[in-house]
């Protein structure tokens, strides 16, 4: 079996990306359904998430990297109802070296590299 090439990235705020990479956060809540069932890059958006989760991770607000692709995760399922969907995540992998995307990030999925 050949390894599937990753072509998509999902934009998520910190500290939620860090929570996914640590295996703490296994569901991403979105207003849109997704039919994607594959490994995607995790892009840490520039806009921060809720500060209370930084404390739960034991890190200072603003101390986690943003504007970079920090890892990958598999989207394995999507459940819910219109306006409130749960994207089920599995098998997060942290990149040894974060990557700056070549293309401008979008709110949900985007193709980060010119291929």
List each language-model region with its residue ranges:
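Structured alpha/beta reader/binder surfaces that contact nucleic acids or chromatin modification marks
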Residues: 2-115
């Amino acid at each position: 079996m050949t390894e599937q090439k990753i072509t998509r990235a999902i934009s998520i705020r910190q500290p939620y990306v860090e929570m996914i990479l640590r295996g703490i956060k296994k569901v991403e809540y979105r207003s849109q359904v997704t039919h994607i069932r594959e490994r995607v890059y995790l892009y840490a958006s520039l806009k921060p998430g809720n500060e209370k989760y930084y404390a739960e991770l034991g890190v200072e607000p603003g101390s986690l990297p943003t504007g970079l692709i920090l890892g990958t995760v598999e989207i394995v399922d999507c459940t819910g109802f219109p306006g409130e969907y749960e994207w089920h995540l599995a098998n997060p992998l942290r990149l040894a070296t974060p990557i700056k995307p070549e293309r401008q990030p979008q709110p949900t999925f985007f193709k980060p590299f010119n291929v």
